Amino acid sequence: MIILGIDEAGRGPLSGPVVAAGVILDQDKIIDGLADSKKLTEKKRQSLYQQIITHAKAYTIVEISPQQIDELNILQATLKAMHQVANNLERQFDKVLVDGNKLPNWDYNSEAIVKGDSKIIEISAASILAKVHRDNICLEHDRLYPQYGFAKHKGYPTKEHLENIKKYGVLDIHRKSYKPVQVLLNE
């Protein structure tokens, strides 16, 4: 059975897109060390990212913008990204395994698996692709807006990030529907 593993990164941050990735692994090309991206060092994630995009049978990465997140809400934006991932790889898999407890509204043979990124290697691989891709976006944001410190906090609502929003203002890359950003917009 050919499995498509799907996971996302970036639901909690105040800025940047939510990213979903899907991976179909080549059973003849074993990638050692696949695990939940949150449990790996940045260096290990980068190394595995390269191995996954080189050796996977197929993969895709989808971004949903902060503006779309504000329009839809984060759950619907995440489900939309996952749906797009499956559509991008349509007819290449027999079953979809998604990390978490919610599935998009689709007709694919699928299952949501809580902590799937720690249990299913295809989901682990998707977790790594989504996390590294999103982290790279944050590094680009840091290059464009160095005073905000995106390389350090990756958009999460740290004290430093909130202070920098207060000091320098809300950017287009910020999610304006998120309460901490709304509060700062209304000050």
Swiss-Prot record:
PROSITE patterns per UniProt: RNASE_H_2
Reactions catalysed: Endonucleolytic cleavage to 5'-phosphomonoester
Keyword set, alphabetical order: Cytoplasm, Endonuclease, Hydrolase, Manganese, Metal-binding, Nuclease
Enzyme Commission (EC) number: 3.1.26.4
GO molecular-function term, one example from the UniProt record: RNA binding
Chief location category: cytoplasm
Needed cofactors: Mn(2+); Mg(2+)
Cellular compartment(s): Cytoplasm
Manner of cofactor binding, per the entry note: Manganese or magnesium. Binds 1 divalent metal ion per monomer in the absence of substrate. May bind a second metal ion after substrate binding.
GO cellular component, one term: cytoplasm
Annotated positions binding a divalent metal cation: 7-8, 99
RNase H type-2 domain segment(s): 1-187
Biological processes per GO annotation: DNA replication, removal of RNA primer; mismatch repair
Disulfide bonds: none
Class of the enzyme per the UniProt entry, highest EC level: hydrolase
PANTHER family (alphabetical): RIBONUCLEASE H2 SUBUNIT A, RIBONUCLEASE HII
Role according to the record: Endonuclease that specifically degrades the RNA of RNA-DNA hybrids.
Family assignment from sequence similarity: Belongs to the RNase HII family.
Identification of the protein by name: Ribonuclease HII
Biological source species: Francisella tularensis subsp. tularensis (strain SCHU S4 / Schu 4)
Source organism phylogeny: Bacteria, Pseudomonadati, Pseudomonadota, Gammaproteobacteria, Thiotrichales
